[in-house]
Amino acid sequence: MLYKNINEFEQVIDKTKRIMCLDFGEKKIGVALSDKTNLIAIPHSVYVRKNTRKDLGGLYGILIENDAGSMVIGLPLDLFGMGNELCDKVMLFANRMIKKYAINIYLHDERYSTAMATRVAKLANIKRKESQKIDDKIAAVLILQQVLDMVKIYQM
């Protein structure tokens, strides 16, 4: 099922499984996973997109291999919180993933995540050429950590 409300998503999370996060892009998708306690976001990989069918299978494979039970996908709203063409593509992708694999997906506002990822890399003295290779998975980590922190608050 697709969730836009963190409180509703928190109620359906399988606490025995990890959570996977995607920073969705036209050419690449950043992937991050929670640790087994669902407290810490860990970078996983940058998935290079092929076509929708292969992308669905490849990303679902990562989910299964890492014993994840649900997914977070960054929703790239504009600066005013409005949807755009990429948001529509994210929604379509999420709905296809749900239809094919029956998993719970939470869409999280990812405004500024790529800019923050670039800044994190810069602060870590990673050269721009190198950071471009990892920005997507850093962005996925930042998105997932926000969600994990929000879930932790709802569980208190």
From Swiss-Prot:
Under the heading CDD domains, the entry gives: YqgF (cd16964)
Q: Which domain of life is it from?
A: Bacteria
Which Gene Ontology CC terms are recorded?
A: cytosol
Coiled-coil region(s): none
* Record-linked Pfam families: RuvX
Q: GO molecular-function annotation terms?
A: nuclease activity
E.C. number(s) listed in UniProt: 3.1.-.-
**Location of the protein in the cell:** Cytoplasm
- Alphabetized SUPFAM superfamilies for the sequence: Ribonuclease H-like
A biological process from GO? rRNA 5'-end processing
**Recorded family membership:** Belongs to the YqgF nuclease family.
Q: What's the protein here called?
A: Putative pre-16S rRNA nuclease
Organism, by scientific name, is: Ehrlichia ruminantium (strain Gardel)
